């Protein structure tokens, strides 16, 4: 399996066939309205960023946004941070979901595949009924506008319904996946002072049953004012904890649906950053921002319609989950899977390919790392399963290697639209992605999304090509965060994105603009780790490792694997004397898995005499990583600032040996 970087795997759609796609039809409206003509996607992109007000007004009109009051402008202010979108409008995200479900009331809309409870299907009407019952239950518990509702739930229909029920009230949704340990959960939701949590009792991961009862008890003990509802999932007869409601009791009544109109910028959902420099940042996304951005993504960039059956493999803690349920905006059916896709084997009945075939799905979103594992394992999905209905694969979470892209076309389907993408929790969307109009080149991403003024900049703030630069966005996007929870003065917000160039969003990814006018992400330019698309902050590791008596110090690094894998390495220094390193490593991995999540478990533990720190105590993660990689970015280590400079060469040698 060998495919050269940049090899064209799928040609651009001929111009006279654009009207076979949702994007093509939308762009024809633009051409007719403004008297312009686009020969290719890049010309359309250039128009969209040069005419932001007109472009986003056309998105608003094209998708018939329901507003209970007129807006007075498209962009009242372009200042970043703080851009003011559609001032005066009064909308509700959930009302648009409701409209689509009413139009698809009698067809299967959620196709559920769970290793815990088996298979089920919900029609649009069943989902509407569940949303109404949950909304009634929330009201009965005193939940209203501005309250925070937490779901400690897997990717199942009830989670989807709870999100939209919460949104309908003007309450704020927050999801933490059940594989997260109690400390990871509390690091996130304690910031929010949530009013209510809905949690499962446990779940199955492959053949293993995992209870969440003790974890929920610990979470509730830390937040005694928070009300709790338990959904029996692992055990239908599970005991409901004292002071909590059963899901059945919570949803026993139903009242007619209503929607609280809110301002465009009003909070809809809180997603969490990785926690690189402390507790994870609580990133607030607004009703209007996600509504417009997700309509654009789902319909135009992804070319999804109500004729599609979409399968997004995602944990509920990933921003992809929040994006995935927005496919309901256009009436597309969703396949929900909760379980281990590698059980009982990579080519077994729970393989993502098997689920795709069995559910007759037309669209897949998965992790690039999953595609890499399948490719390197010699799987031939197109021969093993009937994937004749599959027409598109989106992948994200890490760069997709050229060889793996070639494998997709050779072994999955020769006519697919393969669309690697990269964006983030920060915008709950993409900065570079695919397009149904554009060619597919191995190891690269095709385009910048319409309306996204994305560039690669060098240190001098000028565009660069053919080499890594900082991914920047020089104009507002509707889905940029409204604010960070608890960051009243925008201090953390500004420091996160605007500390390098005032008024310019710096995302923290290295981005290459290629000679083919395509795009490639080569890794993070900050200390955030990336495990299969879920960004993990080093501060989360240190919060639980620092108190360990057997450890003197620790440092966690991430190295991108060019073949699509991800390597998380932990450098550990022993506190006193000798210890059984094999047993300690096993115990520490179990501890990390329990307290944080399986994604946090390091691939390799390296024992070192010390970790690189300055005299002020700062861990030198990025400088050490750059030194090992041989990258001269001006951040290589000045030995004079190190507490133990004599240990540095040995640490670098140990890292290089592991990475060799």
Name each model-derived stretch.
Residues 151, 176, 180-201, 216, ...:
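AMP-binding/adenylate-forming catalytic core of the ANL superfamily
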Residues 168-249, 368:
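Structural core segment of the AMP-binding/adenylate-forming
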Residues 300, 391-518, 525-528, 541:
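Conserved AMP-binding/adenylate-forming
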């Amino acid at each position: 399996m060998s495919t050269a970087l940049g090899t064209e795997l799928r040609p651009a759609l001929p111009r006279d066939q654009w009207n076979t796609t949702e994007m093509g039809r939308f762009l024809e409206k633009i051409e007719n309205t403004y008297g312009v003509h686009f020969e290719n996607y890049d010309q359309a992109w250039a128009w969209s960023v040069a005419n932001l007000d007109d472009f986003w007004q056309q998105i608003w009109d094209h998708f018939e946004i329901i507003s209970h009051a007129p807006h007075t402008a498209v962009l009242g202010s372009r200042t970043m941070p703080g851009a003011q979108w559609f001032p005066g409008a009064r909308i509700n995200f959930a009302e648009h979901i409701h409209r689509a479900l009413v139009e698809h009331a009698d067809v299967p809309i959620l196709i559920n595949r769970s290793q815990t409870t088996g298979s089920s299907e919900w029609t649009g009407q069943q989902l509407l009924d569940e949303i109404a019952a949950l909304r009634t239950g929330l009201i009965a518990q005193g939940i209203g506008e501005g309250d925070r509702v937490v779901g400690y739930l897997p990717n199942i229909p009830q989670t989807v319904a709870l999100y939209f029920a919460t949104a309908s009230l003007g309450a704020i949704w927050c999801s933490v996946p059940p594989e997260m340990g109690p400390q990871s959960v509390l690091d996130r939701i304690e910031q929010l002072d949530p009013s209510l949590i809905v949690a499962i009792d446990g779940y199955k991961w492959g053949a293993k049953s995992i209870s969440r009862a003790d974890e929920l008890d610990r979470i509730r003990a830390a937040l005694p004012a928070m009300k709790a509802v338990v959904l029996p999932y692992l055990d239908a007869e599970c005991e409901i904890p004292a002071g909590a409601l059963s899901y059945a009791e919570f949803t026993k009544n139903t009242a007619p649906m209503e929607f609280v109109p809110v301002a465009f910028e009003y909070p809809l959902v809180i997603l969490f950053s990785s926690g690189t420099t402390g507790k994870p940042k609580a990133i607030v996304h607004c009703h209007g921002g996600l509504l417009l951005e997700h309509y654009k993504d789902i319909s135009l960039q992804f070319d999804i319609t109500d004729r599609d059956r979409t399968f997004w493999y995602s944990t509920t803690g990933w921003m992809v989950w929040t994006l995935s349920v927005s496919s309901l905006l256009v009436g597309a059916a969703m396949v929900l899977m909760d379980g281990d896709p590698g059980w009982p084997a990579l080519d077994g009945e729970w393989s993502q390919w098997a689920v795709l075939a069995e559910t007759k799905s037309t669209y897949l979103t998965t992790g690039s790392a999953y595609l890499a594992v399948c490719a390197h394992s010699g799987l031939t999905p197109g021969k093993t399963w009937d994937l004749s209905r599959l027409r598109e694969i989106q992948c994200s979470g890490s760069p997709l290697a050229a060889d793996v892209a070639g494998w997709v076309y050779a072994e999955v389907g020769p006519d697919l639209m393969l669309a690697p993408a990269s964006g983030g929790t920060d915008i709950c969307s993409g900065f570079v992605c695919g397009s149904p109009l554009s060619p597919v080149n191995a190891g690269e991403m095709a385009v910048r999304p319409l309306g996204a003024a994305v560039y690669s900049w060098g240190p001098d703030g000028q565009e660069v090509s053919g080499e890594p630069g900082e991914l920047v966005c020089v104009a507002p996007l509707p889905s940029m965060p409204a604010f960070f929870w608890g960051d009243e003065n925008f201090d953390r917000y500004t420091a996160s994105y605007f500390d390098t160039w005032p008024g310019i969003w710096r995302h923290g990814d290295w981005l290459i603009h290629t000679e083919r006018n395509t795009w490639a992400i080569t890794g993070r330019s900050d200390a955030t780790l990336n495990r299969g698309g879920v960004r993990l902050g080093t501060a989360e590791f240190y919060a639980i490792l620092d108190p360990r008596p057997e450890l003197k110090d620790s440092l966690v690094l991430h190295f991108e694997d060019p073949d699509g894998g991800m390597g998380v390495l932990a450098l550990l220094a022993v506190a006193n004397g000798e210890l059984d390193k094999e047993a300690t490593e096993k115990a520490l991995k179990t501890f990390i898995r329990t307290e944080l999540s399986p994604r946090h478990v390091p691939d390799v533990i390296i024992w070192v005499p010390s970790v690189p720190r300055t005299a002020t105590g700062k861990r030198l993660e990025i400088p050490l990583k750059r030194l090992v990689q041989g990258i001269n970015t001006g951040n290589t280590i000045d030995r004079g600032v190190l507490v133990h400079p004599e240990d540095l060469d040995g640490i670098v040698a140990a890292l290089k040996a592991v990475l060799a």
